[in-house]
């Protein structure tokens, strides 16, 4: 009867669960972290190390987190945790953006506008309470992602200390000469009832009426002279303009031409029984005339825009208004007519050129900007022909204005077009340019633009194209409108002179005093402040500014309110946000940083793409393709979500679908199963007693430690370069190829069959221990919950958390003078592949059932054969085959042949050996198994 030798084998055993069961297990781990105060422990453990500060860009405190939030926070968490392992102290202070319109709107829905049920003080308090509620909701979601940070002490832009530091930051901007006031055209949202900054604008397709309008010459002969021709008495002369905003025509005060553009005097369509000659850019004349129904191009003269400067035209429906011809750099001959109607109250370029010609001094405010903050024409707006404009909304009035132009013969062409148009990012409604008194950070007054462009060169940009993107934005951007006409925000704490409008000469000092009061009592103190408390007898001459600061200024000065205020220093090592933040937080932080310190507030900027479905479509409720992070965590676990984020190419759009999640769950299982196999084979291993020195290891074990060292160097470099996708690929490849298909497969024989405390087995366990120690660290930034779980199962004494350590130092490269060095292993593994190819057809035709049933012959040149012959008896373990013979050959190529074995099979190790049955007490065992069961055990040197 056969004996049962199962009890003589060292089979794997571990309590580390095979199933991750992450949705159930992760909350318990999270609760333990909270109870032990993990974040503070991390900081305490890292005290004295060099700082690495990833500064958190504040999400808006409104609503549950979405997938984009999860991507952002998890990428940050991966980087921060990798910095702890790299030997840094890496504080992470999460923050929230708490002021602004969305919160005002939410409060208005419940309580009405200011003055309805609540006064301004009560309204601000409700806004504060609402924001705090939203923060508490989002904080739970963020923590569930496994993000470790100072959640008990985050920064909030609504906190009194932050609001005070924001006013102090503004005082530095003032001190450095960057703040200006003026009635410039700014983006204006009728729904917000406020000015908008560049960062609050998004472009969407919109249909607009495109019209060509004739501005008749006041003196046709004067224009003819500019062209060097005499104009017949029965000919009218006009300058056509092309616009997509007919509503701005009541504000039209001039027509701009390009000084260096060539213009022609062309025969146009007749008007009121008279011929009409039109002034058109030469490059556009033919196309324009086709729009007007004129088939033949007939030219009467040619000149430049400079020659037409200061000519006078008639407004198309305000006959008493003289329209001056200007020269402007903004005019081109790429589209339209080459002439631009100029409404300084509704266009930035129009404003600049009108200011240059002194037009703003000739007209009152109602003529320059005839619409109010709701988009309604002022009562002072004259009618257009018979059409009353006063009290009408501009969008509704457009059709009537076009009708007036058609009736009086000024309309040369009309057709609707679809084009990209600025919209409010909150309301998704079209915005306009509207000149109102605002506060600006000037881009050029104190050289801010040039200084900011220079600062961009000092920053590392990931991906590299981010640099060119933000450069072009800063280079072309207008002054930054930082004032808002709203209630919930940090006040622009300035006193302006009632007569001159100038700010108080001691403004910087006064702002510091206001900030001290705000720090103690909050922003309401500004509104209740009696000016005499600070200004004394001067108070009667000054008034308080009632505008509040743009929320982009709030978040833009977090380098002052957080980095400087909390002692982290400036600049931060890294800012990391979505790719839309080149025009948002990256830029507002850059401008305030340069305005205050003359340097960028960050050393590096990293951007990630947006999430899309597997077809590249933006995720939305209407398409039904949205995936919520909460659903992923409840079904699969946060570590699966984290693995997807790490494995995706975040520099582009990040695709997610249920199939992609399934693939990541499969990848997670591969990683977990590898870790479990390592732990299972470390059963009974105590590194304090059993760890073998590297130079005493079996050669294969020493080689796998070398491979792990090589891998760790690549992983460290990838973490340093924020290349998480490469790390995931390296890990999966190592688990599948180096371990799964090779090392773990080969060493099973040694681990299972050799005596428990034999050198060969302890050597393999030592290698696995080194790999398990390193592996847990490698995955810790990404699989934060699983690494914590793994850490608790590693043999030996350990620190309280994997992140209390640094990268594993038990790995080392294989010396070049080792008996089998890395090159030797490359050659042997190439032979192993040849063996597998030779055995494949033998398996297919039934000659063998398994590789152990084949005997291998290797023919190699004499030098190679001489090197491999001493290994021959152990090569069968590397190849997982029957006996191996090495023979010298006259060729430089290596040849492998195989034949089925005729030797008996050992029931314990399954190898076919000639000595099976020689021991009478164990007739079914081979000689080495007899030795391993009853004697001193076999000796392994190589594999």
Swiss-Prot record:
For whether the record's keyword set contains Oxidoreductase, the answer is no
List the EC numbers from the record. Answer: 6.1.1.5
* Chemical reaction(s) catalysed: tRNA(Ile) + L-isoleucine + ATP = L-isoleucyl-tRNA(Ile) + AMP + diphosphate
Cofactor annotation comment: Binds 1 zinc ion per subunit.
Xref: SUPFAM superfamilies: Anticodon-binding domain of a subclass of class I aminoacyl-tRNA synthetases, Nucleotidylyl transferase, ValRS/IleRS/LeuRS editing domain
Which intervals of this chain are the motif 'HIGH' region?
Answer: 59-69
The UniProt record gives the binding positions of ATP as 621
One biological-process term from Gene Ontology?
isoleucyl-tRNA aminoacylation
Per the annotation, the residue ranges of the short sequence motif 'KMSKS' region are: 618-622
Main enzyme class? ligase
**Gene Ontology cellular component list:** cytosol
Q: Where in the cell is it found?
A: Cytoplasm
Per the record, the domain comment is:
IleRS has two distinct active sites: one for aminoacylation and one for editing. The misactivated valine is translocated from the active site to the editing site, which sterically excludes the correctly activated isoleucine. The single editing site contains two valyl binding pockets, one specific for each substrate (Val-AMP or Val-tRNA(Ile)).
What family is reported?
Belongs to the class-I aminoacyl-tRNA synthetase family. IleS type 1 subfamily.
Report quaternary structure and partners.
Monomer.
User: What does the function comment of this entry state?
Assistant: Catalyzes the attachment of isoleucine to tRNA(Ile). As IleRS can inadvertently accommodate and process structurally similar amino acids such as valine, to avoid such errors it has two additional distinct tRNA(Ile)-dependent editing activities. One activity is designated as 'pretransfer' editing and involves the hydrolysis of activated Val-AMP. The other activity is designated 'posttransfer' editing and involves deacylation of mischarged Val-tRNA(Ile).
Q: What is this protein called?
A: Isoleucine--tRNA ligase
